[in-house]
Amino acid sequence: HDVYGGDYRITGDDGHS
């Protein structure tokens, strides 16, 4: 998870952290 929230479509992070 990104601490700042990632774009899950691109980064694979959940976008909610």
From Swiss-Prot:
It is found in: Cytoplasm. It catalyses: L,L-cystathionine + H2O = L-homocysteine + pyruvate + NH4(+); an S-substituted L-cysteine + H2O = a thiol + pyruvate + NH4(+). GO terms for molecular function: cysteine-S-conjugate beta-lyase activity. It comes from the Eukaryota. Disulfide bonds: none annotated. Keywords: Amino-acid biosynthesis, Cytoplasm, Lyase, Methionine biosynthesis. Pathway: Amino-acid biosynthesis; L-methionine biosynthesis via de novo pathway; L-homocysteine from L-cystathionine: step 1/1. The keyword Cytoplasm applies. Belongs to the trans-sulfuration enzymes family. This is Cystathionine beta lyase. It comes from Papiliotrema laurentii (Cryptococcus laurentii).
